[in-house]
Amino acid sequence: MMSNVANASQRQENPYIIPLPPSSTVETSTEPPRTLWMGDLDPSFDEATIEEIWSKLDKKVIVKLIRAKKNLLIPCSSTSSSNNNTSEENAENQQSASNSTDQLDNSQMININGISFIDPSTTQLHHAGYCFVEFETQKDAKFALSLNATPLPNFYSPTTNSQTNPTFKRTFRLNWASGATLQSSIPSTPEFSLFVGDLSPTATEADLLSLFQTRFKSVKTVRVMTDPLTGSSRCFGFVRFGDEDERRRALIEMSGKWFQGRALRVAYATPRNNMMLQLQEQQQQQQQLQQQHQQLDQEDNNGPLLIKTANNLIQNNSNMLPLNALHNAPPMHLNEGGISNMRVNDSLPSNTYNTDPTNTTVFVGGLVPKTTEFQLRSLFKPFGPILNVRIPNGKNCGFVKFEKRIDAEASIQGLQGFIVGGSPIRLSWGRPSSSNAKTNSTIMGASQYMSSNGLRAPSAASSVDNSKQILEQYAEDKRRLFLHQQQQQQQQQQQDGNFSMEQMAHNNYYNYNNYDYHRNKNGSHSDLVNLQRSNVPYMQEDGALYPHQYSSPSYSLHPTGNQFSNATNNLPQFGNAMSISMQLPNGNSNKTASSMNTNPNTNMIMNSNMNMNMNVNPVPYGMGNGANMYDVSRMMTPPLNIAPNSNNSKSSIMNKHPNRNNVPPIHPSLLH
């Protein structure tokens, strides 16, 4: 306790460490603010334990613990990994059932795509990770704020039957609450929020609040998002303003601001209490834009009959999920651009598009001008098969048509408010097309489809509430899979490296393939490894390259006579760069595939029609391993001639690179 008091006295020397109460709280309350928000609570803490913590510091408090919401998925893999760093730490955490997931058996955990989560249906969650603490005086509350980032007292709690802080790694995380006391009413005033990213791992709410309060007086609250179990910072948060002009000014002034050794990244965010207004404005904008949105197919006169038949099938099959009830499922709002399970309202705005069980089209609003259809497809792809993506010219919106209704539902809930290009996107139902009514996938039960995707299949739905819970869980599972895939891609890109075009050109991949291969059988192994590491795609500031950015030269050759061999020797020798196809001129019908044997990484097939295909693996960056030669040729300028191989084709398979599947593609501009 003495160490905590000493740390507090040191912190009080700096006036910016202890922030002032929010101006809105002071103006709307007759009592001085003395209530704090307290976060990063151990999952086993209860009111009595928290009161005892403050009692150890000679402070009498009243605690209001916020209970956890049902069906909240809490990851336990992060805690497990952190607890396995040292055997001593792991042994200490065994004393607290909440600090380690090693004590959970398989029945208490859910495994989704290699990530373990606590099963809320079998494990009791005591609270949502935070509470509100009311002190006797404002002076006591300010003293408590001075304890930010200091370790919690460690003692044996009889109510939890464990130590409160055995590792001394759980620290105080405190900030002013919106209400002056626990009984004070919180006025519903407009809030204007900013997303703040690239925070230091040690930055607290009080630090961030102090930083913004010195420049903007209307700052109301600050939140730094943390891991629900370990309490470690996720290095981003949100700042709420009471004045929109100050938020606009903060966006300009605080972007790139140096804070605790890092440059801040700032963007607009949407606060929770503004979502209803946002949804109304979005609905009006959607109706205007959908007048310009052409249907992919013409209306089918048999559509209503098929819908009626689908509903009858659902009613007659207890294992089917009533899709006509899913439109009442609440949207999963990403609070202020972040990730959360908080509900904004009980249902989406009711309209004909929303209630149509055959509709699989999602309207995407709030796109930045540079967003491409490929980016939009990549964003929504983890939620299920996509039939079509369209961004109207000159409009900051788009439409994503899914194959299945439940995937569209999941994407609306899972990506609502997701930050894309620094701006949160707005999602709702778009105008349906008749092709939605022509597929049987719209009447597929949710439990059946979830199982086919490797997700944990829920029990059959028997009520609307159960349908909401199933959809929320399904959307959350897909969203976590999406974020996990993004993280894996970023880690892979970091491992591969991020070399500039000049560095790649300096590696001279052409000379290596064309000369060293014939000279020394691919050179040494170390040279090959260095080549693989250096030959990586060029990454722009806004991410990877996309198909429309490939401006490939024409590979159509028209040599005559003996010039054929020389011409083919001048083909781009960037094995594994891309797949091309060429139509041989009639005057060279006697040439064989062996005359083009210049690239050890190339497979070449010549059929009886003298159409020659040269395939190089893998395909260009951004197309994925599943793309074929036709996919690649379509995006070239001009399109290349593709001739399918016939049964009587004669082929010559050329030598393969020993590690051809591991060599990443190069930037297409080097092919010019």
Curated annotation (Swiss-Prot):
Residues 36-159, 192-271, 360-432 form the RRM domain. It holds the Pfam family RRM_1. Keywords: Acetylation, Phosphoprotein, Repeat, RNA-binding. The modification N-acetylmethionine is found at M1. Gene3D superfamilies: 3.30.70.330. Residues 77-96, 645-656 have a biased composition (Low complexity). It comes from the Eukaryota. GO terms for molecular function: mRNA binding. InterPro entries: Nucleotide-bd_a/b_plait_sf, RBD_domain_sf, RBM42_RBP45_47-like, RRM_dom. SUPFAM superfamilies: RNA-binding domain, RBD. GO terms for biological process: 3'-UTR-mediated mRNA destabilization; mitochondrion organization. GO terms for cellular component: cytoplasm; cytoplasmic stress granule; nucleus; P-body; perinuclear region of cytoplasm. Residues 1-40, 77-102, 640-672 are annotated as: Disordered. The modification Phosphoserine is found at S524. Residues 1-13, 23-32 have a biased composition (Polar residues). PROSITE patterns: RRM. May be an RNA-binding protein involved in control of an RNA processing pathway that influences the regulation of cell growth in early log phase. Can bind to RNA and single-stranded DNA but not double-stranded DNA. Present with 1540 molecules/cell in log phase SD medium. This is Negative growth regulatory protein NGR1. It comes from Saccharomyces cerevisiae (strain ATCC 204508 / S288c).
